[in-house]
A protein has these predicted regions:
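Basic/polar N-terminal segments that are highly enriched at the extreme N-terminus
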Residues: 1, 21-24
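Sec-dependent N-terminal signal peptides
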Residues: 4-15
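Sec/Tat signal peptide C-region and signal peptidase I cleavage site
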Residues: 16-20
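An acidic, Gly/Ser/Thr/Pro-rich helix-cap/linker signature
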Residues: 23-96, 102-105
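Acidic/His-rich structured neighborhood in mature extracellular/periplasmic domains
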Residues: 37, 77-216, 220
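Intrinsically disordered or highly flexible coil/loop and linker segments, enriched in small
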Residues: 43, 110, 224-228
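Solvent-exposed loop/turn segments at secondary-structure junctions
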Residues: 54-56, 122-126, 236-238
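Flexible, glycine-rich surface segments
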Residues: 165, 169-290
Length: 290
């Protein structure tokens, strides 16, 4: 019994020391990061104001190492995010914002069904936008070594947006990864695609008008075409070379014209309604949904 108590006592102090070291090193990192921020034309006044209270958040590192998108199979991931309760909440949101939703669909030519689905997945129609201090989250991930450069750039962009009075830093609470608002925009997405749709001289992504229109603007700018073909289920022949099979949509390799891939598809005539010149890629589904 004494050995067990001793073991946990040592473990407790060991973890405490690790956390203390991280906090000390984090404060040193902030001093160095300030020089980089100033070199990127962020005012010292803004930096000192918004970064003074940023803290190293140990939980952010834990969340970064375990993300459900990477560990849950497709069936589990989808079922958690497509409940009847969520569906009804989406219907309520549409009924309460019908005029805005229809205006945005017509202006940006993005299907309302797509936008509503994305909003449901990201924040359950604005009911859960996250409670993490985004500045501390981004600073923690910038200090961390795993994806430091990516999050450093995001933090610098966010500081610049604050410096230019485009965003109120006091409202910056969201996801552990630094995403913000009803559609969970990262700072670079805010910079490049967020818009002041209600023309109040302020971009508020926790406001339905700005958030919904910004999401539509983002999809339009990255090339989404309304009612254009996206995914179709096919059955492949056994002789297709494995190099043409993608296991993820994140990085599609070997894109070819549809006419090329038809030779490997059973019943290719079922795809005749699509233009043969379309560039396509093949994605294999997870084993759990085959």
């Amino acid at each position: 019994m004494k050995k067990i108590k001793f073991f946990f006592l040592i473990l407790f102090f060991f973890n405490s020391n690790v956390l203390a070291d991280n906090n000390n090193d984090f404060e040193k990192w902030k001093i160095d990061f300030k020089q980089r921020a100033l070199a990127n034309n962020i005012s010292e006044k803004t930096f000192d104001l918004v970064m003074a209270d940023t803290k190293f958040l140990e939980n952010v590192i834990k969340y970064d190492r375990y993300q459900p998108e990477f560990y849950e199979d497709t069936k589990t991931y989808v079922s958690k995010r497509s409940s009847t309760k969520k569906l009804n909440k989406g219907i309520d949101f549409y009924q309460n914002n019908k005029d805005l939703i229809n205006i945005v669909e017509n202006k940006f030519e993005i299907e309302k069904e797509l936008l509503l689905s994305l909003m449901g997945i990201e924040t359950n129609y604005g009911t859960y936008v996250g409670k993490m201090d985004i500045l501390s989250s981004l600073a923690t991930l910038s200090y961390d070594k795993r994806r430091s450069e990516f999050f450093t750039k995001e933090l610098l962009i966010l500081l610049k947006l604050i410096d230019e009075n485009q965003i109120d830093y006091k409202s910056l609470y969201g996801s552990w990864a630094g995403a913000f608002g009803f559609f969970q925009f990262m700072p670079s997405t805010i910079k490049n695609h967020a818009i002041d749709f209600n023309t109040d001289n302020y971009i508020d992504l926790k406001n339905s008008h700005d958030a919904y229109a910004s999401a539509a603007n983002y999809l339009k700018k990255i090339g989404w075409k309304k009612n254009a073909p996206c995914f179709y289920r096919i059955t492949l022949k056994d002789d297709i070379p494995k190099k043409y099979l993608n296991v993820s949509a994140k990085k599609l390799l070997n894109k070819k014209k549809l006419s090329f891939f038809k030779q490997y598809v059973q019943n290719p005539d079922k795809l005749d309604f699509l233009k043969s010149s379309y560039k396509v890629a093949i994605i294999t589904p997870d084993k759990d949904i085959i």
